[in-house]
């Protein structure tokens, strides 16, 4: 169900500044490895825009992955320490699999990765001894090419059979503590984004020779 403008206009909101990509001729490159201090991790240049960010909690039941590309659900976890890697994989992975299956109706769910982000002022993301930092740029994680490739990377001989059916890559996010005042998560209603607005980027996981 797509939310009407009248419904959206009636929601609580805040104004915020988000970093979009400055238009550029070449494809941006993101570097996912340790770099010397001061070296940017992306060739893309951020362009700040002030936008309206709505609180969709009052209409959470009207949102869906199939329409808006997002779902807001309540979930109680048995995890006691989200900074404990073993507990995350032992307890939270099965919880997340059950949650995604319930929300999507999927017959099979595989959790293949997780990231715990915690703001450290002055910390550099992906640097030794620093937890992963909040992402400060508007972005999408997968393209029509990299999504199926992720399935091939993970599923081996099963991949082509699985790709002959419908599949989704779903991000599950939650606050470890709240309320969040520093870097709360914002997501975009997919019905408001044109496919032509997406800019594919290249991700480099190792230093070139």
What are these regions (language model features)?
Residues 3-209:
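Non-heme Fe(II) oxygenase catalytic core, chiefly the N-lobe of the double-stranded beta-helix
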């Amino acid at each position: 169900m797509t939310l009407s403008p009248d419904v959206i206009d009636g929601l609580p909101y805040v104004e915020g500044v988000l970093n979009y990509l400055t238009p550029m001729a070449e494809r941006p490159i993101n570097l996912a490895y340790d770099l010397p201090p001061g070296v940017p991790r992306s060739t893309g240049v951020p362009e700040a825009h002030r936008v309206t960010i709505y609180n969709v909690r009052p209409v959470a039941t009207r949102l869906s992955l199939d329409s808006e590309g997002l779902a807001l659900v309540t979930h109680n976890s048995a995890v006691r320490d989200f900074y404990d890697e073993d507990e995350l994989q032992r307890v939270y992975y099965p919880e997340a699999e059950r949650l995604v299956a319930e929300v999507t109706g999927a017959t099979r769910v595989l959790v293949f990765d997780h990231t715990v982000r915690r703001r450290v002022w002055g910390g550099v993301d992906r640097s030794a001894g620093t937890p992963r930092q909040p992402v400060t740029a508007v972005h999408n994680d997968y393209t029509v090419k990299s999504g199926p490739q992720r399935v091939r990377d993970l599923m081996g001989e099963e991949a082509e059979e699985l790709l002959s059916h419908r599949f989704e890559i779903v991000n599950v996010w939650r606050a470890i503590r709240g309320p969040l005042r520093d870097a709360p998560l914002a997501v975009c209603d997919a019905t408001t984004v044109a496919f032509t607005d997406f800019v594919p980027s290249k991700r480099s996981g190792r230093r070139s020779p």
